[in-house]
Amino acid sequence: MSKWTHILAIITAVYTDHDNTIKSRGRLINVLNNNFKKLPIISGSEQNATVSLNINDYFNPDRYDYSFSISIYGNLRDRSIKETLKEYNNFLQKVNSFFTVTDHMYKIDNDRFKTLIYTSSKKKKKIIIDSEDKMFKRLDEMKI
């Protein structure tokens, strides 16, 4: 029987145009897309997670910082929570190498009633939710 992992995540980031070469929204889209193509995948045996780039409609050519978000959605066959989390963290690090990540959050769960939720807040906690028992446990207290 196959095991499934499901991921839902959003990353907000900023692209800083140090050379002030971005003069149009189209140029910004090209710069972001060129770096976007270099990002690693979050994989499953049937299909990979879908990754979407969302650019703010507002464009001001006098600014040097341009904010955008990346959304990730996937139903990943033959993956564990741990494997998906590792690939997500690799993806996040690569995003941060091209841009400046300002915030991120994710929910990763499986079909065995385990859910991992993270939001980058002041507390910086990862929480495991055991949906079957309605118990909350910290990540370091539970083996996944």
Task: Please report, for each region that a protein language model flagged, where it lies by residue.
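Short, extreme N-terminal segment that most often corresponds to the first beta-strand
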Residues: 1-33
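Charged interaction segments
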Residues: 24-144
